[in-house]
Amino acid sequence: MKKILGIFRGFPGLGRVVSGVSLLETLRDEYGCCIEIISYLQGNRYLELKGYENLHEVVPMDYCSIGLLPTNVTGAYIHEKIRCFQPDIVIIDGEPLIIQALKISYPKLKIVALLNPADIENEQNDQDAMRYFNAMYSLSDLAIVHGLRSVSNTGNYKKLVSVNTILRKEILDVNINSTNNIYCLLGGGT
């Protein structure tokens, strides 16, 4: 049985947690994988709603504007989780510093980065910052870019796959009924 650990950015929104959890639950339910999930802040509130228990809580010094810091309490917790759980694959969404830290500590560990197209190409962001983020994300063994637009590998990534937006199973199971009501779903930065 494959063991998969998911580490999903828990703020400022839920987009990275929702898609990551959906992917892990599909791997568990459809392919028999054993899964563990780490998130924080709003991400943990979502996991609680989904029935997950015994969630690790961050302290303010555990994270910054670009995500988790690998050198504080939660960073140590992630390393301990990897040593105890011994995952075959770690799927990380929105945590560039964690990808780098895990590749330093566990160079043979297979890491998959879930990314938005704007994580790879974004003219609105400072381009020096984009080069930094791409350097961190490209340390992964596989980058899965999911969104409304396709991106190509500029040669920095070991393997990059660009796919349409990952849809939750609940959305695919919706029954369509004709009504005069209009509904709008908001979310996501891209």
Language model features by range: what are they?
Residues 2-11, 26-73, 77:
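Conserved nucleotide-sugar phosphate-binding/catalytic loop shared by glycosyltransferases and other
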Residues 3, 88-89, 142, 181:
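Structural motif
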Residues 8-21:
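A short, glycine/small-residue-rich beta-strand->loop->alpha-helix junction that serves as a flexible
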Residues 38, 58, 112-117, 146, ...:
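Generic beta-sheet signal
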Residues 45, 90-105:
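An aromatic- and histidine-rich active-site surface loop
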Residues 79-95:
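Short N-terminal targeting/anchoring amphipathic segment
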Residues 89, 105-122:
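Active-site proximal beta-strand in glycosyltransferases
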Residues 122-189:
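A nucleotide-sugar donor-handling region in carbohydrate enzymes
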